[in-house]
Amino acid sequence: MDNYSVQNFYNNDRKPLKPTTLHDGNIKKSVYEDVTYIRKLMCKEIMPGEHDHKFYNYGYNKENKYK
């Protein structure tokens, strides 16, 4: 699936007045399978960087860090 197809899915392939979740049959089955496959690859193949260790701490809360 190329960049145009992903952009087309998020901007054009949705039907009006229908939920926008990916899993409700809102798009063609082939596009659904492509999008879920890309999401799985992104989740598994993006390695954490050296600065990401702070996000794994139990008490880290970036939203309330400066309050």
Swiss-Prot record:
Domain of life: Viruses
InterPro entries cross-referenced by the UniProt entry: Baculo_8kDa
Entry similarity comment: Belongs to the baculoviridae 8 kDa protein family.
Name listed for the protein in its UniProt record: Uncharacterized 8.2 kDa protein in HE65-PK2 intergenic region
